[in-house]
Swiss-Prot record:
Protein name in UniProt: Threonine/serine transporter TdcC
Lineage per the UniProt record: Bacteria, Pseudomonadati, Pseudomonadota, Gammaproteobacteria, Enterobacterales
Topological type in the membrane: Multi-pass membrane protein
Family annotation (Pfam families): Trp_Tyr_perm
Entry keyword annotation includes Zinc: no
Amino acid sequence: MSSTDNIVSGKAQHSYWRKSDTTWTLGLFGTAIGAGVLFFPIRAGFGGLIPILVMLVLAYPIAFYCHRALARLCLSGANPSGNITETVEEHFGKTGGVVITFLYFFAICPLLWIYGVTITNTFMTFWENQLHLPALNRGFVALFLLLLMAVIIWFGRDLMVKVMSFLVWPFIASLVLISLSLIPYWNSAVIDQVDLSALSLTGHDGILVTVWLGISIMVFSFNFSPIVSSFVVFKREEYEKKFGRDFTERKCSKIISRASILMVAVVMFFAFSCLFALSPQNMAEAKAQNIPVLSYLANHFSSMSGSQSSFALTLEYAASIIALVAIFKSFFGHYLGTLEGLNRLIIKFAYKGDKSKISMSKLNTLSMVFIMGSTWLVAYVNPNILDLIEAMGAPIIASLLCLLPMYAIHKVPSLAKYRGRIDNVFVTAIGLLTISNIVYKVF
């Protein structure tokens, strides 16, 4: 083959795009769009127009560079079929495998607690404000909803996997539709409140603190890290043998980039549309009421009384129902991951890695009791959801998504070629800023 043919062949490889690449682009995108998105407009809009514009600039770099770093770590293992746990064990030994198992479990379990609080508050808000029924006991509502989900999960897991997978796209479509439908209700309140002479960079309500806290909710909302390991394994098995690891890395990066663009476009449009239809004060009220933005929108349009349009009347009921479905979808998906993670920890520490010492049904029952029991307790206590995200959920995700890959890049020889890059500094900074929220929340 001539040098010209080699160049043409190389260009063909770089532009090579399969149907499976599109499928994974949409899969990563769909994984990230869940119940967490319903809280992003509240935190992003809480500080007004300037902070959310800064977040708009940061959104794509956070989504792309952080997930690409994790994908590169997954790609660094010798075994193309090895998942992230095997890869970390290869680089850092059995201790590294234990650490990654703990990180995965504690990155997902707090999300269940968050969703337990959210689904309880959303249901109670719908019950009282849309159905106009007497208030119910919080402990009873939380217990009923969790038992209902436990029964559905226990007896219809396979069916629910299919149903939840199907619901991803209607949920995304509903977010886009709501964003578009809110346009006639946009107002200039958020713009009118911008006073450049009164802007403060520092202080409790300053731009820097607002953006700093906003980074946590962005890490939480723009997150498809649970599926990155499976995604990389699939692409390595598909491309690496024929085209090599470098090509596979570029292919994974391109897919992650396109998924990030889709994700940022949908979520930021939804956030801006909510903010322009409401106001920063409304977002502060939503935070205080501890409900997702769709529930607040439903209550907001409900208060319009006789002046409601047909859309406002529809949204009053549809928004809460969409929120409930979204939360259940996210709860179910994260429950499976939490169950698997807790099962691995129990087998590893209680039975020294011997699966034969306990039946899977007994193990699943023990894990379910702990997961549902702890989720009910948190839902009953009703901590502020955004505070819980910023103090627990996002920092643990950041340690897995940002700091672990950066540590590996500086320690693992096969990742040495990625050292000294400016995007490494950015990813490390995002990870540290997110984790430092714990200190801010405590003090």
